[in-house]
Amino acid sequence: ITLAEMLSDNGYATGIFGKWHLGDTKGRYPTDQGFDEWNGIPRSSDRAFWPDSNSFTPGSHPDAVFTHVMSSFKGQEPIELEVFDRAKRATIDRDITDHAIDFIKRKANKEEPFFAYLPYTQTHEPVDPHPDFYGTTGNGSFADVLAQTDVYVGELLDTIDKLGLKEDTIFIFTSDNGREGVPRSFGFTGPWRGSMFSPYEGSLRVPFLIRWPGKIPTKHVSNELFHQIDLFPTLASFIGADIPKDRIIDGVDQSNFLMGKSEKSARESLVIYIGNELFGVKWHNWKMLIKEMDEDGYGIKNMAYPTVYNLLVDPKEEVPELNYLNDTWVDFPLYQVMEDHEWSIENDPGTPDP
């Protein structure tokens, strides 16, 4: 069951506007997975390079075809719109913001509860700001896109507020990974080591901001563990919905933590994957890696013995085992997290790919 399916089953209109990238075959589009409507792209943003590439070879492979912006509604086949090239790349985030605002207004006018999901396509490569923002910061295209995104998110907030829905709307801003790990990327991960496609904190830590006036305390900052999969049971709790009892749900209900009823997160641990590779686990402020990543490329290093980081002592992950010999007891809870996860995979392997 998806988040959109759970919300739809509980009376919410559901719309996605932006990048899907979770399947682009019949039965796997967002409107097959709980969303009522969708406008966006089905694959990754880098495909915008292809139509403008002098070396692109048409017919080289059945899957090596240009991406199109797509639109679909539940119960209908998606339709292809314009080619997703560099020109469209620069304007698509404006378009999906407008689609989302229109969706919100339509549902508000009907007094219908809604779930609007906007997976923006920026700042993945190619980083192409809208013409309205190109050159506005004086600090290059990446900074222009940050300013652009700030404005677009502000428009969404303003829409909610002007419709009188502020107190009744949960607004979340977050990301799915740290900066893109390519030399041309100008993303920034602060003091954290690594980038996307690495097992380090620069990949795992992302911003998470949530607004729900009167329910979630304002101006509160926390360093507690929180995983995006926690949103499923947490949002279900917020709306009083039941979650399935016939399968393992990896997320934990964080409603008490977010609403200030508990200072501690309900999550004690998480597992670290890159693709299908299990790299390690985190438990409280401790981290154990059984594999590491070559930071000059994407080579995987299998460790003869796991590396252990105390992230309170070594937040930059510079010195494995720093002060670790005094605390080898932590091996037991760290290994237990990994064993529990492996048990859950064996006992509930999930839905097979079609």
List each language-model region with its residue ranges.
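Formylglycine-dependent sulfatase
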Residues: I1-P306, L311, P315-P354
